[in-house]
Design a protein with these regions (language model features):
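A nucleotide-sugar donor-handling region in carbohydrate enzymes
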Residues: 3-18, 142-212
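Conserved catalytic-core segment of nucleotide-activated headgroup transferases in glycan assembly
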Residues: 42-57, 177-254, 359-368, 386
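Short acidic-hydrophobic, aromatic-tinged amphipathic segments that line or gate anion-handling sites
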Residues: 81-87, 172-173, 264-268, 322-340
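Donor nucleotide-activated moiety binding/catalytic core segment of transferases
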Residues: 245-292
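C-terminal amphipathic helix plus adjacent low-complexity
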Residues: 336-386
Length: 386
């Protein structure tokens, strides 16, 4: 439990007094929502932390309920109490009378512990927008509502045959990217950010270019494009499935450290993903939410296709990449693509249109839409057990 002392909430007989006192303390904040965290080891670092600033900016108070102890240390600071609740009884004790909404950030197996509570409104926020298969899971049917960044996410569900009614969706934009700069930075030399995605746990989510073309990409940019500086930021979970990812990371980091002169291993500087996106003039990434978030800047995007699909097949499979420059596994056309993105950028207008489709355009901005939709659910009729 990270309430004040990293102790586990307990209502067992020998600790009942302490547990009741803790619940009373939590109730004084009058929380109206909770964030339910059940993830694979240490995923809170990149799944939960990206939502904490938006959650902290909400006018309403909430709780962060963590099911696994290994998620606690990676959590960033938050104004909301963080409660370690390892058992079903602990979770049940935290559905305080004023709590009306439960937010979920991933499709964890242990979500069912809370989903069965009929009094709450269960809302999937997810942890990013992309054309990955996991972004259109049939598990979405378990939730009362899904709050998405933009219309592209709703289209994605329908294409996958998951045609829920419009009342099951709310478009709130992406609060995480509301503060990113828009348009060219005007800085020289310009920065190319290479941010490959996670390799995925199964075939349908194998999108990472890191161990396919990443090393050669960085080598060629360093050797042939002195007008650029390369920043490297691999997905934090890289190497969990494929050890070859770790070898690629080590080789790229070695090249960048040797090159110096503004070329950067992001981990050496401790930059956040938001800082990386703000500092980049060009993004090279894979099918992932990183590209969706970077659309907020309206700057050029190069998407890697490690599978080597034809351009038509790639866009058919990943529609939100229609406004990205496509780079195949053999890096064919790399110099031409870089000339385009650093020059007249012929995909700029298509990218600006895609930005609205992917990230939405809610009145008042994403944070206001986030807060307004929470108010809507909190002020709706209380549901009782059915």
């Amino acid at each position: 439990l990270a309430w004040t002392g990293l102790r586990a909430l307990s209502v067992h007989r020998d600790q009942r007094t302490w547990g009741e006192r803790l619940l009373a303390d939590l109730a004084t904040d009058d929380p109206s929502f909770l964030v339910y965290v059940s993830l694979a080891a240490r995923q809170s670092k990149y799944i939960v932390n990206q939502w904490l600033p938006a959650l902290d900016a909400l006018p309403r108070n909430g709780l962060v309920v963590v099911r696994e102890a290994n998620q606690l240390a990676p959590l960033a600071p938050t104004r909301h109490p963080v409660v370690y609740a390892p058992t079903t009884r602990h979770v049940e004790g935290l559905t305080l009378p004023g709590v009306r909404v439960a937010f979920y950030l991933a499709y964890g197996e242990r979500n069912a512990t809370l989903l069965r509570d009929p009094r709450l409104r269960h809302v999937m926020l997810a942890h990013g927008d992309s054309d990955k298969a996991t972004s259109a899971s049939a598990l979405i049917r378990a939730f009362d509502e899904t709050w998405v960044a933009g219309p592209a996410a709703i289209d994605r569900f329908r294409t996958a045959g998951i045609d829920l009614g419009p009342e099951r969706f709310a478009v709130i934009g992406r609060p995480q990217v509301a503060g990113l700069p828009v348009g060219p930075s005007g800085r020289e030399p310009r920065v190319l950010l290479y941010a490959p995605t996670f390799e995925g746990y199964y075939e349908a989510t194998t999108h990472s270019s890191l161990d396919v073309l990443g090393v050669e990409l960085v080598r060629r940019v360093l050797a042939g494009h002195p007008e650029l500086r390369v920043w490297f930021r691999p997905h934090p979970a890289s190497g969990v499935v494929r050890p070859s990812m770790l070898a690629a990371i080590a080789e790229i980091e070695g090249m960048l450290r040797a090159a110096g002169d503004g070329n950067l291993v992001v981990a050496d500087r401790g930059l956040t993903m938001t800082e990386c996106l703000a500092g980049a003039d060009v993004l090279v990434s894979d099918v992932s939410s990183v590209i969706s978030d970077y659309l907020a800047t309206e700057r050029p995007v190069i998407v890697c296709d490690p599978a080597g699909l034809t351009p038509d097949a790639f866009v058919a499979a990943y529609p939100s990449q229609a406004s990205s420059y496509l780079l195949g596994p053999d890096l064919a056309g790399l110099d031409t693509i870089l000339q385009q993105v650093l020059g007249d950028d012929p995909l700029r207008e298509a990218r600006i249109a895609m930005k609205k489709h992917v990230l939405g355009d809610p009145p008042g901005g994403p944070q206001a839409a986030f807060a307004a939709n929470l108010d809507r659910l909190c002020e709706s009729d209380v549901r009782g057990p059915s």
